[in-house]
Amino acid sequence: MAEIDARLREEVHLLGELLGQTIRTQLGDDFLDKIERIRKGAKAGRRGSAAGAEQLTSTLGDLGDDELLPVARAFNQFLNLANIAEQQHRVRRRRPDEPEPFELRVLDELLERLLAAGQKPDELARQLGRLDIELVLTAHPTEVARRTLIQKYDAIAAQLTALDHSDLLPAERERIAQRLQRLIAEAWHTEEIRRSRPSPVDEAKWGFAVIEHSLWQAVPQFLRRADRSLQAATGLRLPLEAAPIRFASWMGGDRDGNPNVTARVTREVLLLARWMAADLYLRDVDQLAAELSMQQASAELRAQVGDSAEPYRALLKQLRERLRETRSWAQQALTADIAPGAAVLQDNHDLLAPLQLCYQSLHACGMGVIADGPLLDCLRRAATFGLFLVRLDVRQDSTRHAAALSEITDYLGLGRYAEWDEEQRLAFLQRELDSRRPLLPSDYRPSADTAEVLATCREVAAAPAAALGSYVISMAGAASDVLAVQLLLKEAGLRRPMRVVPLFETLADLDNAGPVIDRLLGLPGYRVRLHGPQEVMIGYSDSAKDAGTTAAAWAQYRAQEELVRLCGEHQVELLLFHGRGGTVGRGGGPAHAAILSQPPGSVAGRFRTTEQGEMIRFKFGLPDIAEQNLNLYLAAVLEATLLPPPAPEPSWRAMMDRLADVGVKAYRGVVREHPQFVAYFRQATPEQELGRLPLGSRPAKRREGGVESLRAIPWIFAWTQTRLMLPAWLGWEQALGQALAGGEGELLKNMREQWPFFRTRIDMLEMVLAKADASIAALYDQRLVEPALQPLGAQLRDLLSQACAAVLELTGQSRLLAHSPETLESISVRNTYLDPLHLLQAELLARCRLRQQAPESPLEQALLVSVAGIAAGLRNTG
């Protein structure tokens, strides 16, 4: 196995040493020796030493209740420190003889390929400037790290960057080491787990913090690099107002199954976003006013400021006053219903115009080098983030809209909307949408649930259009689901177009997505209300939970193909919104490969996707890493637009049909039909305990019931904690196994080599199987599962083994990830620290279940820390 980079090893070792010193100072040599025995036992056990495994098990088993929490914290902290070192390694300064990382050279190489393929330079520049990519930041119940700790981790990363300079004096190196020691001690002495669930507003503030501390710096850096790449390839530059990647958010807008997200919360989050945006621009404008002291200005700028000796400062002073007014109003409006004054900025144009005027004037007066400095960065931010920072989506379940309309139609004496068939619903909705009179009489008094739905619609109607993204309808299944929301918004006073987006998330709904959109686009009057592309959201999480990833992936692909075809027939542009999670079981995986594996024609210059809580931190938490990931998105969407993959061969489609059919039967045969499955799941995993932990503002369940009532995130998170990773692979072992046994290996190998969709699926499957660990899953069974259910656990581990064997046969390797030794080494290094946490977690679960601990007890706290540590060690968790 290739050794991980020596510098990375040195840094991991350094951070581990400093953590050890911190632990020794607080808890003494004996305790640190115990930690070291556990670590060495885990390492020896991984190398096949029975004595090492025995040492690990006995040392952990002998721990007293008072020792469980500090042991869990030690391994949790180490995994977080290893993550920091690994992230930092990805962006560290290269030596002159080292190539740039793929993430930074990907756009340059793509532009060369596109020009070689015959793209005209001006068309290429135009297409790059027109790209419309939106990353939608979502809250995440398994993002367990507190914001306080994330800030400390970022500071540790900054010190590692400083340590990277080869010309440091010994005294400077010593100062950095002392600062690192202090930061690690601060992290160790900070409680890593919050005592109470975050509110939706807390979650939104967490999202704003990522923008403030990372994306605010990363976006202009990323656009500078894209501009340089374009100029080097074509001689042309990105337009000043180009914003190929923008950001939206679900934090404070996603009320699906979360009663804590109310209309009041949505209003508060919208105001906080405006406050934060104004505050960030004020910092920029203060810096610009200090720098732009020049006297020479264009006639256009002079017309705005007269004969001021410092015309740029005079113009920026006007903007600064308006930004202060905006921030002050947003602050006051949080506690009182105050109308914005005339000076409050309401339109992005009012923010951009003075900045553009300064920029154009500087260029006109021969000071382009000054214009292209911080002023250009501020302009890029203004084009990307605007006055509202992120566009807030609203999401609600279709049943809530139907219930509200049922109550209204019942009150009006029209019968119950929920009991009508689709034709009756559509006739009623179209009639009311065309009517000029209000639907609701003034004396109508709605129930609490209906009042909340209507209040949300009123907030949407009252908010500026640029503050909002889409209104997403979860569990959509019919054209009437979309019209229902349009009617409720009309009733709330909305007089402008709003994107109302059906989310298709079960297998049946994905198969029905084409007919629903076909019906919708054919309805009289619908196209008039559309204004722009038809947006459709594809759900990855619930379809995989419903049918397994084999059938779900193929259903998602086919649904997209059908939507592309139908929108083409109707001559309507299509925007696909991908509801991906962080894990393979929820559609996660490397974004670049995922985008390039979409059906031909489905990207077409537009791409919208969710970015999940814990993945936001890993992909966008540090400016340099954020820049790399933004580069990947830009290059992938440009490539998928201009060099789309070929349509799959008929034989490949037929094979995928067979794989999906076998896969869904195998998956449901276990998850839905095995009589012991639910009982086994609840005993073998921390599923029940996860519901009690303060991990997010949203409940883990939609309602009482079995697996089907669980949300997709805790369903996957529970299996990840035990390393069985079942949702990501179950079904593939039968599907691939049968095809290979039937002599279809050559066809499968051709599909993997020539079809990006299939290659990406197999690559992600291989990655998750490499992280899965049957021996760890067996330990949970031995400690937690009653004997009558243990044979099912053994059967599932056998299926895991079959899945691994099938992937190895298909890829022609002797071990998983043999082609990626760095990834294998990374998993191997983490296992040394993960193994004790898994054993400890199984022990904690056993003790907690035996004694029914209170949430604040040391045992419950230790359990929560073990959950956080395993999540940190495995990265993409739920």
Curated annotation (Swiss-Prot):
Enzyme Commission code(s) on record:
4.1.1.31
An MF annotation (GO) of this entry: magnesium ion binding
Required cofactor(s):
Mg(2+)
Task: Give the enzyme class.
Answer: lyase
Q: Tell me, which GO biological process terms does this entry list? A: carbon fixation; oxaloacetate metabolic process; tricarboxylic acid cycle
**Which residues are the active-site ones?**
H140, K545
Could you tell me which InterPro entries the record lists for this protein? PEP_COase, PEP_COase_bac/pln-type, PEP_COase_Lys_AS, PEPCASE_His_AS, Pyrv/PenolPyrv_kinase-like_dom
Query: Which keywords describe this protein according to UniProt?
Result: Carbon dioxide fixation, Lyase, Magnesium
- Which SUPFAM superfamilies does the protein's record reference? Phosphoenolpyruvate/pyruvate domain
Which Gene Ontology cellular component annotation is one that this UniProt entry carries?
A: cytosol
Per its record, the protein catalyses: oxaloacetate + phosphate = phosphoenolpyruvate + hydrogencarbonate
Gene3D superfamilies (UniProt xref): Phosphoenolpyruvate/pyruvate domain (1.20.1440.90)
Function (record text): Forms oxaloacetate, a four-carbon dicarboxylic acid source for the tricarboxylic acid cycle.
In which family does this protein belong, per the annotation? Answer: Belongs to the PEPCase type 1 family.
NCBIfam families attached to this UniProt entry: PRK00009.1
Q: What is this protein called?
A: Phosphoenolpyruvate carboxylase
